[in-house]
Amino acid sequence: MIVTNDKQIYERAMALKDFGREIGVKKQMEKSFSHSTIGYNFKFTEFQAAVGIAQMRKLEKRILKKRSMFRKYVDLLSNVKGIEFLKTNLKNVTPWMIDIFLKSSVKRTQLIKYLEKKQIGTRIYYPPIHRLKPYRDTDQEYKQASSFSDRGLWLPSSVTLTDKQIVIICNQIKQFFK
């Protein structure tokens, strides 16, 4: 779902979701197969649109919760040696996932196993694109992308988490690093 008040973004999104056709072209039969760009069949059903509208009503509350969670994690873990957070300006960004970066991939694997034993789920960071099958035929190393991917870890970040649960998670992480 895209929400915008920018006419250019709106028109581009409408074209992309309708096979690349410009707005209004469908109504003109002779131009209905005129495509100005590559597009896709991304049209919502009425049911999907209704669910999207209902979710939009919750958006502001979720944004506030996600920002609050991020602040809590940073407050509790920023002094732990071996953990880094990306610098995040919460005025412009809503961290949907709470990601931390460890000094090494070995430490990350150890932390994952430790937290699993404590019944705290985590997820490894996205693999860099150059490691995905369609892009492997390259001589480039992409050291920065590999480093971020190998050291990155997502902490629990559901909007249903309570402050108390975040404190428990952070205490376990601190215990691991002692």
Please provide the spans of the model-predicted regions.
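PLP-dependent aminotransferase class I/II
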Residues: 5-178
